[in-house]
Amino acid sequence: MSRKARDPIVLPQGVEVSIQNDEISVKGPKGSLTQVLAKEVEIAVKGNEVFVTPAAHVVDRPGRIQGLYWALIANMVKGVHTGFEKRLEMIGVGFRAAVQGSLLDLSIGVSHPTKMPIPTGLEVSVEKNTLISIKGINKQLVGEFATCVRAKRPPEPYKGKGIRYENEYVRRKAGKAAKTGKK
């Protein structure tokens, strides 16, 4: 049994959970999210708590799927209540970003313009031309888009130039050592 899923998910004030057929929907002040449920879990809502238990017919390691759905529902509750945010910083001469309508325009030292469509449900803002903030209620969508932006120019280990998560540690390498020795 999953250790986290032993505890119920406590619903904050203003968040509602409803279960219909094989689908759970969570509504809150920031929006609503839905998730299709597997047949291996049973969800029960009692007051302001949500309980995730394995179904009676599951024999083979029920904790795996139980822990997965506990985490998915907990992230949905947190997303519709407070939301999620990922921040990226661009390091390099001439690196900058701008939001143009529903596109994120990146100048990252390549010969062609790099424009990325912003997925619906996300709010992207740029501060100081080099700090990108990605906000949304769906944790998976926020993380996936942040990873796609970072993958356009990941930080390189010699000078550290590129796009990185805020406060991400980039392991640095030493450059070529000066030649020494006899000729």
Swiss-Prot record:
Keywords: Ribonucleoprotein, Ribosomal protein, RNA-binding, rRNA-binding
GO cellular component: cytosolic large ribosomal subunit
GO biological process, one term: cytoplasmic translation
A Pfam match: Ribosomal_L6
Molecular-function GO terms, alphabetical: rRNA binding; structural constituent of ribosome
Function: This protein binds to the 23S rRNA, and is important in its secondary structure. It is located near the subunit interface in the base of the L7/L12 stalk, and near the tRNA binding site of the peptidyltransferase center.
NCBIfam families xrefs: L6_bact
Quaternary structure annotation from Swiss-Prot or TrEMBL: Part of the 50S ribosomal subunit.
Family in the record: Belongs to the universal ribosomal protein uL6 family.
Name listed for the protein in its UniProt record: Large ribosomal subunit protein uL6
Organism of this sequence: Chlamydia trachomatis serovar A (strain ATCC VR-571B / DSM 19440 / HAR-13)
Name of encoding gene: rplF
